[in-house]
């Protein structure tokens, strides 16, 4: 099963234009041949910070975290910290909505196996982000 996307919202959180964000995630899944269901959770800074500490040992807020599960028909989860996205959007010369788009693509690419820890990987991932965002 390819490209099944579920957008979920922690209490008090929301995302503008959810159908467009879901469609964008499906485009990445199709382009990268990702199989299975993906849950994208729009959540608080506190939720992302707790998961970042638990799974990465980093006690700080980040914008997006991806967890690949690869079990049955479930590809993984993406957690997007809404407040962090709003704060950092101006740094990237983005609107809040466009920053969410960037984070959806970024999280999806991580689920597809892409990373940005090394210079070459970072360049490839950025090029793919740009490709899907221009789509």
Where are these regions (language model features)?
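An acidic/histidine-cluster motif and surrounding catalytic segment
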Residues: 1-101, 111-135
């Amino acid at each position: 099963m390819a490209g099944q996307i579920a957008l979920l919202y922690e209490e008090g959180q929301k995302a503008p234009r959810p159908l467009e964000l879901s469609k964008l995630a499906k485009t990445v899944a199709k382009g990268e041949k990702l199989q299975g269901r993906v849950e994208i959770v729009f959540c608080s800074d506190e939720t992302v910070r707790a998961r970042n500490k638990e799974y990465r040992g980093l006690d700080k807020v980040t914008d997006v975290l991806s967890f690949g599960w690869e079990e049955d028909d479930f590809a993984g989860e993406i957690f997007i910290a809404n407040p962090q996205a709003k704060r950092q959007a101006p740094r990237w010369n983005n609107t809040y909505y466009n920053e969410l788009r960037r984070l959806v693509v970024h999280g999806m690419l991580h689920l597809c196996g892409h990373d940005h820890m090394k210079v070459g990987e970072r360049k490839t991932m950025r090029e793919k982000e740009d490709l899907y965002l221009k789509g």
